[in-house]
Amino acid sequence: MTFIGWCQIALFGAVVVALVKPLGWYMTRVFAGEWTPLTPVLRPVETMLYRAAGVDPKQEQHWLTFTLAMLLFHIGGFAIIYAVLRLQALLPFNPAEQGAVAPDLAFNTAISFLTNTNWQNYGGESTLSYLSQMLALTHQNFLSAATGIVLAMALIRGFSRASVRTIGNFWVDITRCTLYVLLPICIPYALFLVWQGMPQTLGSYVDATTLEGAKQTIAVGPVASQVAIKMLGTNGGGFFNANAAHPFENPTALSNFVQMLSIFVLGAALTNVFGRMIGNQRQGWAILGVMGVLFVVGIAVAYWAEASGTATLDALGITGGNMEGKEVRFGIVASALFAVVTTAASCGAVNAMHDSFTALGGMIPLINMQLGEIIVGGVGAGLYGMLLFVVLAIFVAGLMVGRTPEYVGKKIEAREVKMAMLAILVLPLMYLGWTAIAVVLPSAVASMGNAGPHGFSEVLYAFTSATANNGSAFGGLTGNTFFYNLTLATAMFVGRFMMIVPTMAIAGSLAGKKLVPPSAGTLPTTGGLFVGLVVGVILIIGGLTFFPALALGPIVEQVSMSAKTLF
């Protein structure tokens, strides 16, 4: 570890925090339908879209209607993605003449991008046409990201409103999010990436002659436009198989820093939106503080583990830490930081191979996902995931003092706690259940690239990543099989929607409650005590849930590596 390395981490954190308030102010006004600097340009477009779709922007929805609209929207999205992938060979913008995607792979990919997971059992440049990348994937990157933000806004309204039956209008929210938030950022962002050296073309792949005289085909395409929303929307699916480790997908140190920044910025800003909408910005800062504590611990451990290397490397006289699977142009600190950022959020993009991290270094991204990616998290999903843990923490605190739990003026009762537990328990049920099945089925075991604890970690990582809607992977696992295409798609679908439905039920329940004025017995929720309480509940619930599985994988692998019995 170096002083310069810690300075890079500190600079990243400082820039994220500096952007929280201005973006929070802007997003609050967008979803409240108030004036913004872009209103004169975009309001006519917004109004035209409502008229074309027959949507009344003043008509709000009950939580169940809101949720059903979201589900119908996703059914349509799935149909479009699947159809484009299966008909790819017949559609235009296919200069490499890619064939139709196999049914099971198309199903897996459609569910993957629908749920904001972007798990990829294929190499983009060798499997998909430009039209598939743009119409099926990039298009869905915008919509899945907007959906996450919209769902977070619905839950925020549940906390901020009183004695009402509605939590907003799904169609209005998703239109405003796409028009006013995602597109205005992604357009200049994509131009910045082109300036940094990223391709943006519909031209054919380039045939080149290397210095040795060999022929090589260089894949290009509409990369910058996809990468911009891939990062901002915490989608993560790469245009190229190597994802952000590819020089065309992440050309420079500056593009690497900005891509990490874009992964975090909207999720962090939503904590400020929460504070503004409930009338107390300190509440938002407290939630961001919980996220910050967990993030700092994670990056400290990951950076230390990768910079320290392994006992085997030390015995060979190799100094400088573990550089296996990392780009020299980024080094250890930028690779470790990217890994923690991409799994603290539900992004899943990678600029290094997580499978090549040390056992302890690779365990941190795994833990981030197993906690539910609540450390900033996916756009929207991180905030509503964190608020579920806040509900449980407030409930525990209420039990300790013998009072009905309250949070920001709303009583937390049995219905909210049951729904929160249902949403939280979905993740371990999926990733532990499918992992247990996969490690005993011969056909699934055959896909493992390694035996022993690391092979177990590969399978556990895959199902954790799918259930948490992350999409990153330990690359040693061959995922493009019928078993993994089907089971990972199931994990992605359940992990997304079985968390959303209980969350929306909580939003509807809270919106119908009266505001309770604070009293002498009300737990303060803006200070260090509250931050510590929430962190403690997260670690206790998480530790009890996934520690046994970690003990079979990365922990025993780390112990073996330290004893020089396993590299």
UniProtKB/Swiss-Prot annotation:
The chain crosses the membrane at residues 3-23, 64-84, 136-156, 179-199, 254-274, 285-305, 330-350, 357-376, 421-441, 473-495, 527-547. The gene is kdpA. The system is composed of three essential subunits: KdpA, KdpB and KdpC. Belongs to the KdpA family. This is Potassium-transporting ATPase potassium-binding subunit. NCBIfam families: kdpA. One of its GO terms (molecular function) is P-type potassium transmembrane transporter activity. GO terms for cellular component: plasma membrane. It comes from Rhodopseudomonas palustris (strain ATCC BAA-98 / CGA009).
